[in-house]
């Protein structure tokens, strides 16, 4: 077993050297690396996804050297899908594929079981994973350029590659370092964790190398384990580290909610919500007049509506300023902060835009027998934390 673990580490250290971003290359890039027009265009598309990128120079070098980098994303099948998992994922994945990336979406069924999602029932978790794929298809994800991989199937088929890697990552890290990563599961270091949940970060770190990912495209809440993967590269003397591209996390719709909660229906828009449900949730959403910071309605517009439509339209009577179409978030924020744009008018425009985006998904789940059956099962499941 020791020999096998050593072989895995050696393979990781030497693989893809032809496209590796060495420290020398990264330095020369910052000292005057010139991207071609095509590479610069691809870079701008990919970089637009991330609230944070570690490291930008490495990303530029990667795109210059590799026509089809592998981008890794993943999810725990854990109940109904909210709009950030649905629409934002479609926006980001389609940007990656348009920039030439191969996207691998890791359906983390074993991870959901480790984290006790759906009560740890793998059959239910499987149903949820299939339901997620139906939503993305209906919402317009470029599935021809996306590879969906079930963690249980991939790990079982390549166990001799996967488990030595997990063990080596575990061996090279102290328990406090692993505990700092439990945020990736929606847990905190002070929670009473099972042994399975302590294993989870080591496995997710291993996924990155197992899938041969060049780019980790996950939310800011997954940042710590992605950084762990880069630190592991230092441990094994691997030059080409995975690039971290972390997207923004949408807040819940109620005041003070940093994240959406599947246990609080008013905190999030779900992908198959009916028009009336969307309207009620937005009407009740926190949206203080003239306040931009911490305003979830404005966040929805910035991260969902504008990327989807390239504009945001407010419909008003002439006496209140008439209809107005915005092309930039800065203009929306300025009008809102000044009081020119009223919360009621902003919410009305947001409702209209959200319902336009969600209508094809609703139609799919009403007309497609398989999708309809999956949703019926999902709604009957009890969501577990």
Curated annotation (Swiss-Prot):
ATP-binding in keyword set: yes
Describe the reaction catalysed, as an equation: tRNA(Tyr) + L-tyrosine + ATP = L-tyrosyl-tRNA(Tyr) + AMP + diphosphate + H(+)
Question: Would I find NAD among this entry's keywords?
Answer: no
So where does L-tyrosine get bound?
Answer: 200, 204, 207, 222
Question: Which GO molecular function entries does the Swiss-Prot or TrEMBL record give?
Answer: ATP binding; tyrosine-tRNA ligase activity
* Subcellular location field: Cytoplasm, Cytosol
Q: Principal place where this protein is found?
A: cytoplasm
**Domain of life (superkingdom):** Eukaryota
Q: Quick one: a GO biological-process term for this protein? A: tRNA aminoacylation for protein translation
Q: Which UniProt keywords apply?
A: Aminoacyl-tRNA synthetase, ATP-binding, Cytoplasm, Ligase, Nucleotide-binding, Protein biosynthesis
| UniProt binding sites for ATP | 262
**Disruption-associated phenotype:** No visible phenotype under normal growth conditions.
As recorded in UniProt, its EC number(s) are 6.1.1.1
Q: Where is this motif: 'KMSKS' region?
A: 259-263
**UniProt GO cellular component terms:** cytosol
Where, by residue number, is the motif 'HIGH' region? Answer: 77-85
Top EC class, one word: ligase
Family from the record: Belongs to the class-I aminoacyl-tRNA synthetase family.
Known function: Catalyzes the attachment of tyrosine to tRNA(Tyr) in a two-step reaction: tyrosine is first activated by ATP to form Tyr-AMP and then transferred to the acceptor end of tRNA(Tyr).
- Tell me what this protein is called: Tyrosine--tRNA ligase 1, cytoplasmic
């Amino acid at each position: 077993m020791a020999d096998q673990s050593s072989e895995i580490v050696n393979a990781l250290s030497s693989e893809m050297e032809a496209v590796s971003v060495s420290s020398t290359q990264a330095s020369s890039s910052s000292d005057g690396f010139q991207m071609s027009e095509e590479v610069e265009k691809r870079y701008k598309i990919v970089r637009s996804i991330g609230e944070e990128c570690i490291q930008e120079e490495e990303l530029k070098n990667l795109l210059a050297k590799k026509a089809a980098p592998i981008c890794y994303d993943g999810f725990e099948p854990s109940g109904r899908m909210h709009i950030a998992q649905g629409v934002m994922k479609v926006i980001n994945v389609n940007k990656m594929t348009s920039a030439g990336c191969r996207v691998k979406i890791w359906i983390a069924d074993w991870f959901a079981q480790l984290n006790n999602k759906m009560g740890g029932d793998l059959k239910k978790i499987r149903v949820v994973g299939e339901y997620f794929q139906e939503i993305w298809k209906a919402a317009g994800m470029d599935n021809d350029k996306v590879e969906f991989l079930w963690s249980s199937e991939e790990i079982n088929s390549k166990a001799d590659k996967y488990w030595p890697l997990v063990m080596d990552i575990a061996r090279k890290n102290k328990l406090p370092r692993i505990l700092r990563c439990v945020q990736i599961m929606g847990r905190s270091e002070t929670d009473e964790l099972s042994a399975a949940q302590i294993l989870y970060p080591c496995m997710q770190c291993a996924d990155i190398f197992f899938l041969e990912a060049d780019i980790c495209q996950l939310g800011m809440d997954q940042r710590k384990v992605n950084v762990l993967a880069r630190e592991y590269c230092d441990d094994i003397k691997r030059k080409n580290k995975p690039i971290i591209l972390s997207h923004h996390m949408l807040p819940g719709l109620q005041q003070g909610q940093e994240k959406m909660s599947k246990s609080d229906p008013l905190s999030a828009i779900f992908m198959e919500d009916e028009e009336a449900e969307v309207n009620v949730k937005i009407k009740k959403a926190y949206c203080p007049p003239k306040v931009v910071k911490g305003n979830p309605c404005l966040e929805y517009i910035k991260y969902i509506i504008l990327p989807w439509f390239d504009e945001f339209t407010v419909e008003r009577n002439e006496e209140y300023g008439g209809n107005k179409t915005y092309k930039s978030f800065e203009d929306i924020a300025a009008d809102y902060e000044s009081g020119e744009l009223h919360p009621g008018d902003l919410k009305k425009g947001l409702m209209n835009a959200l319902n336009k985006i969600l209508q094809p998904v609703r139609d799919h789940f009403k007309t497609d027998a398989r999708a309809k059956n999956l949703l019926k099962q999902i709604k009957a499941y009890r969501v577990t934390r």
